[in-house]
Amino acid sequence: MNLSAAHHQISLSDGNNIPLIGLGTYSDPRPVPGKTYVAVKTAIDEGYRHIDGAYVYHNEHEVGEAIREKIAEGKVKREEIFYCGKLWNTEHVPSMVLPALERTLKALKLDYIDLYIIELPMAFKPGKEIYPRDENGRIIYDKTNLCATWEALEACKDAGLVKSLGVSNFNRRQLELILNKPGLKYKPVTNQVECHPYFTQTKLLKFCQQHDIVIVAHSPLGTCRNPSWVNVSSPPLLNDELLTSLGKKYNKTQAQIVLRFNIQRGIVVIPKSFTPERIKENFQIFDFSLTEEEMKDIDALNKNVRYVELLMWSDHPEYPFHDEY
């Protein structure tokens, strides 16, 4: 794979391309107003052409404003930018899918997006509330029919509102549900999952490669250490001694080593940052490469432990992480 800062796209099975690095725009807690706008502009100036967002991040309007401004400046053309949006759990009902995508397009003020994915395979009670709860504070689940939801996504593609379709946090069984669906029109081209040296996803990666599905790694640098939703029993990834020593060898940060590891495996990375220096640093991964031996050594760091377990929803019938992969 001959990658450079200017050319770092890989092909999707539907004929479209996806840049191997994108800017993640999720923040917990929510970013201060204006912060996402600045981050996206910084990223585009630096050479990023892929922005990963979602309705539930509450900042798609800022992402759109930044993209449109950079297009108006002549820095980029719309077709050079790759935006991924996500369908949230409360909108899996087929009749709600198109309006959900249209709301994203309205927030972005764009005519189409490049990739629309089902954010999680777990449906919640349909409606306006993002986290619908019962009187005991528990999330109200809904019966999931992933195939019906997928058909509604296919209709969005037919309407020209999105170029590619994918999923996120799906296990093998859930991917097979879609892949084996009678009358399947468009295959999922991506599966966005947690993936990094402590959680290498080798089996899921192999399965996805067999079906021409690209893995997009969320939390590619590990995550924040918020114990309310993060498994903090696994040590912070970026403190690892091997990554530190490789960083010294290549004059790179541990984060750059980790990101390089995944892109050399053909995995797309979407590190999130709202700090201009970090946004720039994360992109500087095209001027070195790891040896085969180093790749094996990093791969051997795998602990098979997730940071993002979503245990609060582990009793959902479609909770994806009970299965081995």
UniProtKB/Swiss-Prot annotation:
SUPFAM superfamilies: NAD(P)-linked oxidoreductase
GO biological processes: androgen metabolic process; bile acid biosynthetic process; bile acid catabolic process; C21-steroid hormone metabolic process; cholesterol catabolic process; digestion
Activity modulation notes: Subject to inhibition by high substrate concentrations. Inhibited by testosterone concentrations above 10 uM. Inhibited by the primary and secondary bile acids chenodeoxycholic acid and ursodeoxycholic acid.
Reactions the enzyme catalyzes: 5beta-cholestan-3-one + NADP(+) = cholest-4-en-3-one + NADPH + H(+); 4,5beta-dihydrocortisone + NADP(+) = cortisone + NADPH + H(+); cortisol + NADPH + H(+) = 5beta-dihydrocortisol + NADP(+); corticosterone + NADPH + H(+) = 5beta-dihydrocorticosterone + NADP(+)
Subcellular location: Cytoplasm
Family from the record: Belongs to the aldo/keto reductase family.
Top-tier EC class: oxidoreductase
Record's keyword annotation contains Nuclease: no
Taxonomic lineage of the native organism: Eukaryota, Metazoa, Chordata, Craniata, Vertebrata
Annotated protein name in UniProt: Aldo-keto reductase family 1 member D1
Source organism (scientific name): Mus musculus
The enzyme's E.C. designation: 1.3.1.3
Active site positions: Y57
One Gene Ontology cellular component: cytosol
UniProt keyword annotations, A-Z: Bile acid catabolism, Cytoplasm, Lipid degradation, Lipid metabolism, NADP, Oxidoreductase, Phosphoprotein, Steroid metabolism
Binding residues for NADP(+): 22-26, 52, 168-169, 192, 218-223, 272-282
Entry keyword annotation includes Lipid metabolism: yes
Residues annotated as binding substrate: Y26, Y57, W88, E119, Y131, W229
